UniProtKB/Swiss-Prot annotation:
Cytokine that binds to TNFRSF11B/OPG and to TNFRSF11A/RANK. Osteoclast differentiation and activation factor. Augments the ability of dendritic cells to stimulate naive T-cell proliferation. May be an important regulator of interactions between T-cells and dendritic cells and may play a role in the regulation of the T-cell-dependent immune response. May also play an important role in enhanced bone-resorption in humoral hypercalcemia of malignancy. Residues 69-317 are extracellular. Highest in the peripheral lymph nodes, weak in spleen, peripheral blood Leukocytes, bone marrow, heart, placenta, skeletal muscle, stomach and thyroid. Homotrimer. Interacts with TNFRSF11B. Interacts with TNFRSF11A. Interacts with FBN1 (via N-terminal domain) in a Ca(+2)-dependent manner. Interacts with TNFAIP6 (via both Link and CUB domains). Residues 1-43 are annotated as: Disordered. It comes from the Eukaryota. This is Tumor necrosis factor ligand superfamily member 11. Induction: Up-regulated by T-cell receptor stimulation.
Amino acid sequence: MRRASRDYTKYLRGSEEMGGGPGAPHEGPLHAPPPPAPHQPPAASRSMFVALLGLGLGQVVCSVALFFYFRAQMDPNRISEDGTHCIYRILRLHENADFQDTTLESQDTKLIPDSCRRIKQAFQGAVQKELQHIVGSQHIRAEKAMVDGSWLDLAKRSKLEAQPFAHLTINATDIPSGSHKVSLSSWYHDRGWAKISNMTFSNGKLIVNQDGFYYLYANICFRHHETSGDLATEYLQLMVYVTKTSIKIPSSHTLMKGGSTKYWSGNSEFHFYSINVGGFFKLRSGEEISIEVSNPSLLDPDQDATYFGAFKVRDID
């Protein structure tokens, strides 16, 4: 009895494990459902794709082939063997022939066939055309350079001629006497080293005609020799003043001055003293430049000793 009871109990446990508990319907062992099969494209779609791919590859191959074909046809270095042979014969013929046109023409007729003669004519025409182009371009460049150079020289000459300048030297025939400060009004502007251009000299003053920056300079020499007589005093103030006078706005300004007090004793046979001043100044049209000195009777009258001048450096921005 006990053995039969144990067997029955095992049977019930086995039914619970397989059926999920008492009362559960018996469905047999559980398995995962198989995955669905992938969707296969229709045969017509695959054929269309393969055809399009083939057409695309064919078009690429044809394009590449045409590119290399035309490149080979347009290659300037592509010369046939016959053409090379003709050119070689022509060059050999001209090397061995005399420098007479009649000899060359007769040998061309006898030794060069018609096909090579056509190549020669085409080659000569191309060379002649290229030479004409080179000679013509060089001729045009030479003419252009000549024209440009002429205009440039003319412009330079015109600019130099129009550049204002003046160099004035002392007129020894009209030098004031005395020891006091005086204005020097007697200058040469067209004699010896004196010259003036595009500026005006009037009443002992240099008049500016063009606005601009000018360099002004003055060199004044004083001298005395014992044969000229005794000096009134042994202590002398030897000075020079460069003055600017404006007419539009009445005014006068000293631009530069220089000098010194000297002791000229009667024990010396000869005395000499030189003053030089210079500088850049902005001047307007109509302004006047003049020179003032002390002890004018002691001025050195040589043109390389007493002078003043001006020249324009640049325009006013």
